A protein has these predicted regions:
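Substrate-binding groove/exosite segments of carbohydrate-active enzymes
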Residues: 1-107, 215-229, 238, 262-296, ...
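Catalytic cores of carbohydrate-active enzymes
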Residues: 1-8, 43-46, 124-140, 147-153, ...
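Aromatic-lined carbohydrate-binding surfaces of glycoside hydrolases
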Residues: 36-37, 113, 137
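Short, well-structured alpha-helical patches and their helix-loop capping segments
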Residues: 81, 85, 105, 112, ...
Length: 331
């Protein structure tokens, strides 16, 4: 699955609690809670000239690597790295709390959650419009750039985190009003500016500059995050999944000895040209989309997509039983 390096938000952490490994999950979250940068409170924005200004200079103390940033190595808050792994890590932590109900651990980690939300707002919603930029924040992010625009999936992550923070604050007897207000603000911004009613889909993002156009052909990550983070209402979920069904390429699985003739994979987008992380046939993206079908009430499509991904990976892949990153049908 290409876990070649320490990074705090690999999807694997989601699996610990369903497997009953609550202690392992807690160890993971504690270790990376200790990796959160505490100071300075903020810093300068310094584009990296060695990376054609496409990244921030990886230096602790710069804007992205200031208070709230979670470093890539456990129990070490001194290493700057270009990914925003905070978003997914905090989502995993919140899901862990929902599995375990561990109030004592919540209280211990509460400052980590607060600093994270402040960091996200400070760095990625600079204009305060409720739409957050996406800077290397999800698996597919390597070649995704939005130039400061408002992105559906990162805004959805921040909506859910703020909504849950308000609920968690109440459990601890704290005032969660600011988190609830931010969640309401984000939700309204997404619905007003990123829902494309004519097409029945959430846009990928809205340009920051120029005519502030909305990119109306999202990747599957936009669809499943909108559903998973509870941005989409039932009608929007249905229409968004119809977009996946009708607009995202479906690839039949054909193999010698395979008796099933109704298995199909999907690519992550309908974008061209093909390049890494922009248009792939990736197992995790396929099964996450299958989860969205389940969450959207389309269980038959969900099962068929899930089955297709597992059959291709575990039975037709390079190694029997493997859970691959990219499938054979990837270009």
């Amino acid at each position: 699955v290409a876990w070649r390096m320490h990074l705090n938000a690999w999807r694997g952490a989601y699996a610990a609690d369903p497997l009953g490994w609550h202690d392992r999950a807690k160890t993971h979250f504690m270790a990376y809670g200790n990796s959160q940068v505490l100071a300075p409170a903020f810093g300068p924005i310094v584009p990296d000239t060695t990376r054609n200004l496409a990244r921030q200079e990886e230096k602790i103390g710069n804007a992205m690597f200031s208070s709230g940033y979670i470093s890539r190595h456990p129990n070490n808050n001194t290493v700057a790295h270009h990914y925003d792994m905070n978003l997914v890590f905090i989502d995993q932590f919140i899901r862990h709390l929902k599995w375990t109900g561990d109030i004592e651990f919540l209280e211990e980690m509460w400052p980590v959650l607060e600093r994270h939300l402040e960091w996200e707002k400070r760095n990625y919603d600079v204009d305060g419009d409720g739409l957050y930029d996406a800077y290397a924040a999800i698996w597919a992010s390597d070649a995704l750039q939005y130039s400061g625009g408002g992105v559906t999936y990162t805004s959805a992550y921040n909506y859910y985190a703020n909504k849950m923070a308000a609920q968690l604050a109440a459990i601890l007897g704290k005032d969660g009003t600011s988190f609830a207000n931010e969640a309401t603000h984000i939700y309204a911004a997404i619905q007003k500016q990123l829902w494309v009613s004519e097409k029945g889909v959430f846009g990928e993002y809205k340009d920051l500059l120029g005519k502030k156009l909305v990119h109306e052909n999202p990747g599957v990550w936009t669809i499943y995050h909108a559903i998973d983070k509870e941005i989409a209402n039932p009608f929007q979920a249905y229409k968004s999944l119809e977009y996946v069904t009708n607009k995202i390429p479906h690839i039949p699985i054909v193999a010698e000895g395979l008796e099933k003739d109704d298995l199909q994979l999907i690519s992550t987008t309908n974008w061209q040209p093909y390049t890494w992380s922009i248009n792939n046939v990736a197992l995790a993206e396929i099964v996450h989309t299958a989860l969205a079908y389940w969450q959207g009430g389309q269980s038959e499509k969900a099962f068929k997509l899930w089955e297709s991904g597992l059959v291709e990976s575990m039975y037709l892949g390079a190694s029997p039983g493997a859970l691959e990153q990219l499938l054979f049908y990837d270009a």
